[in-house]
Amino acid sequence: NSIIIPQRLQFAGYTSSQALEVFGKISGMAMPLLFLPFTVTSALVVNIIPNISEQMAINNLRDVENKSSLAIKLTMLVAIPTSALFIIFSDHIATLVYNQKDVGNYLAIISYATIFLCLNHTLSGILHGMGKQIITTINFILGMGLQLYCTYFLIPNPKYGVNGFFIGYLIASILIFALNAITLRRHIKLKLKLMDNLIKPLFSTAIMILGMYVFYVGLSIVVKSNVINTIIATVVGTILYCLGLMITKTIDFKHTINSLKV
């Protein structure tokens, strides 16, 4: 990507300096923010892989199914609000972190892939614990091949431009997720509830976003600082999201912690 994207952008009409500037903002500014949720999914993966490997060795598929379902649920609880936050408050976040509002445009677009990226990370970890490294590698290569194809052929098209990369990135993330999910379902039965894994987190996220918006607008009347307003609104939003999860009984924190320890 570091070679192809700038070159293909020049075919779309960008100058060399413009192409490098756009690529730098995407890869050096927007992408690092996109990977922030991985700090949580990485902790899950590190915790789960050894446990799943042990349970697979003694053919305890029930525990593998329970651990995998819990890991996917926790991933969704992190990925959904993060994705919404990056999409809706992208300009404020980009201004807060980089003092460059235009980076927010790239962050907002690429953040549609957040949920799939996080799920891919978790699903790959589960499959690795089951000894399916070769399959996950093949799935990843197929996804990256599709991404490179879109990058190479869509970016030079003036109709798409740099959005060609985002399209390829999103489609590739969805493809890898689908392949990993299909692979996992062939080996274990996941116990996933639509209400707990999607509906309730979406409801809590809606409360979070609404609360953040109200607080940000209200604070902006008194405090003329994007930094302070964004930080306070984010803290308030996080609290509201956690309260939403507790009110809807989406997750039992004590049970979850104990399950991860076992």
What annotation goes with each model-predicted range?
Residues 135-161, 175-183, 204-216, 236-245:
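Alpha-helical transmembrane segments of multi-pass membrane transporters
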Residues 35-58:
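Helix-loop junctions and terminal segments of transmembrane helices
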Residues 112-142, 153:
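Membrane-interface junctions at transmembrane-helix termini in multi-pass inner-membrane proteins
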Residues 67-87, 93-96, 163-188, 202:
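Short alpha-helical transmembrane segments in multi-pass integral membrane proteins
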